């Protein structure tokens, strides 16, 4: 039976993962599965020690994924989620104190001093601003040439495309008509690393995969 999680960027969402993992190693049992990758992609940062099950699971999934991508990583941070709000709020008093340092109590601030203060403020904002690298969930239709196309081999060709930042998810065969079926498949991407258009043009509909795949259409595209 499918498990439903929501708002995994919030403490409440992570709590639901924590409770689900009680007595389990991974989302769907004792082995890593596509379910773990999908949930991992939706959790922006490692859960705190307040959620020991979720924290241990997150580290385990990260370790398994690292083995699949042996290239040297420089580290990526994800910004813009509600989970990051406390850290930003914690910095606010310090910023206010810095603002006080720039005040001229006697009203004698010159244009040069004012410009210098503005430059310092801009530099502080640039330092605090995290570099964002968002994730997206994509639903795609993959169409065969005809009813004689081996759909098992077609799906193997699709899932055989591997690259950093690309995570294949659940799939199903959907009847189109005249005995033809299409493959509907979900996948998650790191936006800075993978372009759906390039994935389709350079890998899925080019040789050798075009032996089975006629065309691909993006059905849904949602930011995580």
Curated annotation (Swiss-Prot):
Q: Which GO terms describe its molecular function?
A: translation elongation factor activity
**Which positions carry N-acetylalanine?**
2
Q: Name one GO cellular component term.
A: cytosol
Which CDD domains does the entry mention? EF1B (cd00292)
**SUPFAM superfamilies according to UniProt:** eEF-1beta-like, GST C-terminal domain-like
**Keywords on record:** Acetylation, Elongation factor, Protein biosynthesis
Tell me how this protein assembles: EF-1 is composed of 4 subunits: alpha, beta (1B-alpha=beta'), delta (1B-beta), and gamma (1B-gamma).
What this protein is called in its record is Elongation factor 1-beta 2
- Record organism: Arabidopsis thaliana
Its taxonomic path starts at: Eukaryota, Viridiplantae, Streptophyta, Embryophyta, Tracheophyta
């Amino acid at each position: 039976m499918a498990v439903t999680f929501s708002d995994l960027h919030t403490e409440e969402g992570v709590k639901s993962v924590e409770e689900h993992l009680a007595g389990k190693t991974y989302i769907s049992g004792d082995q890593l599965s596509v379910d773990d990758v999908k949930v991992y992609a939706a959790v922006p940062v490692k859960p705190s020690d307040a959620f020991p099950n979720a924290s241990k699971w997150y580290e385990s999934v990260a370790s398994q994924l690292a083995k699949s991508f042996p290239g040297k990583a420089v580290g990526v941070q994800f910004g813009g989620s509600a989970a990051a709000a406390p850290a930003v709020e914690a910095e606010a008093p310090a910023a206010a104190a810095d603002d006080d340092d720039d005040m001229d109590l006697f009203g004698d601030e010159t244009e040069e001093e004012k410009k210098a203060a503005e430059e310092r403020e801009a530099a502080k904002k640039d330092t605090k601003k995290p570099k964002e690298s968002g994730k997206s969930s994509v639903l795609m239709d993959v169409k065969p040439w005809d009813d004689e196309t081996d759909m098992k081999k077609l799906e193997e060709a699709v899932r055989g495309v591997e690259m950093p930042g690309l995570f294949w998810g659940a799939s199903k065969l959907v009847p189109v008509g005249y005995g033809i079926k299409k493959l509907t498949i979900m996948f998650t991407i790191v936006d800075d690393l993978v372009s759906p258009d390039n994935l389709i043009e350079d890998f899925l509909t080019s040789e050798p995969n075009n032996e089975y795949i006629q065309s691909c259409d993006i059905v849904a595209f949602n930011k995580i």
